[in-house]
Amino acid sequence: MPLHRVEALGEPQDRTGKTFSGRTNGPISSPLTDTERRMSIPQNPAPVNLVGLSREEIAALLRDMGEKPFRAKQLWHWVYHRGETDFSAMTTLGTPLRAKLAETCVVARPHVVREQRSEDGTRKWLLRFPDGNEAETVYIPEDDRGALCVSSQVGCTLTCRFCHTGTQLLVRNLTAHEIVGQFMAARDAYGEWPSPTDESRQLSNIVLMGMGEPLYNYDNVAKAIGILLDNEGIAVSRRRITLSTSGVVPMIRRCGAELGVNLAVSLHAARDEIRDEIMPINRKYPLAELMAACREYPGASNARRITFEYVMLKGVNDSEADARALIKLVEGVPCKFNLIPFNPWPGSGFECPPIRHIERFANILFEAGYTAPIRMPRGRDILAACGQLRSDSLRERASLHKARLAAGVADDHAPAAAPLADTPGAVA
């Protein structure tokens, strides 16, 4: 398959089928069925979505069209710097090229199924991809800027007991097109095209802390980060991208060597016996191995510290002894902590400790020389806070909707009818 076909909106339709000649020396066959007739007609391949293509792939696509190399830079500028979706508006491209692109390509974002806004300004989008699967993306505002929390998988395979996403089994990895598309859809919503300067942009940071484990989808995540970093396109600074992992030890080293982005580690316990219970991945990569990988992370220094995320769970990991064990555990790692009050979700079985307990925990870390802010919940009222993301499948939502109606319960959350293809253009 040619390189430029990798990120098509959908697989080409099946072109196999019987060959029927107009003349035959044998007996006359029976009339074609409707299905056979449709199969015998050649189908056009699905359009190529330019979002998610690398520079090399865009260059290959244009080369196959007979275009000169400089056109790749121009097209890159229109797609990733200006966010343009209409080929006719790409005025630096020749008219014949624009016509060819319009016939064979699209510049599409994921379809926005639902947008929710929190009282604190947090925004959450439920995005649908061409195959009907969905993921959530969250914008977290901070004064005049903010971070976009991006998902890397539909569902998650890790089943961390305190995380709502972990209750949704892994469906599949997101492609580079779908990861980059989340950011571009958010830019559409905020009108941040062309790419603004670092000082003026609202979507200033990207955190790969949404649904899924990024290091279990490394190739697609790495490709997406490369596109996001390119200073002639979306142009997000490397120091403003943070990748969060639950502790996939072998991939932590590779991430540091190849990507060099900020690293956050979902730690949540200082002792193996506790972490084994709340984070099953610890049974494969225990704390000693995880800390060794963190100490070796390229670029980690006092000026660029690893962030350890620590969800405070009442009676589980919030004691003074836990705080002291944490200090001993991270010795030799340039790091800081984010203490996260547990954000409840239906059926979790956990509780958040009283704030005074969390403050006491933070003070112990602070007195040992570590920065340990308490990260106050954002978007909790729309289930957009840390650990609350989950995108039920269309089938699950339809089943729940049917059950509610059968029980005579009013339901304002019926599954929306939407095309199983990306939505070209700006987000509504």
Curated annotation (Swiss-Prot):
GO terms for molecular function: 4 iron, 4 sulfur cluster binding; metal ion binding; rRNA (adenine(2503)-C2-)-methyltransferase activity; rRNA binding; tRNA (adenine(37)-C2)-methyltransferase activity; tRNA binding. Its EC number is 2.1.1.192. S-adenosyl-L-methionine binds at residues 212-213, 244, 266-268, 343. Binds 1 [4Fe-4S] cluster. The cluster is coordinated with 3 cysteines and an exchangeable S-adenosyl-L-methionine. Keywords: 4Fe-4S, Cytoplasm, Disulfide bond, Iron, Iron-sulfur, Metal-binding, Methyltransferase, rRNA processing, S-adenosyl-L-methionine, Transferase, tRNA processing. The active site is at residues 136, 386. Residues 1-44 are annotated as: Disordered. Disulfide bonds join 149-386. SUPFAM superfamilies: Radical SAM enzymes. Its cofactor is [4Fe-4S] cluster. It comes from the Bacteria. [4Fe-4S] cluster binds at residues 156, 160, 163. Residues 142-381 form the Radical SAM core domain. CDD domains: Radical_SAM (cd01335). Residues 1-17 have a biased composition (Basic and acidic residues). Specifically methylates position 2 of adenine 2503 in 23S rRNA and position 2 of adenine 37 in tRNAs. m2A2503 modification seems to play a crucial role in the proofreading step occurring at the peptidyl transferase center and thus would serve to optimize ribosomal fidelity. Reaction proceeds by a ping-pong mechanism involving intermediate methylation of a conserved cysteine residue. Belongs to the radical SAM superfamily. RlmN family. This is Dual-specificity RNA methyltransferase RlmN.
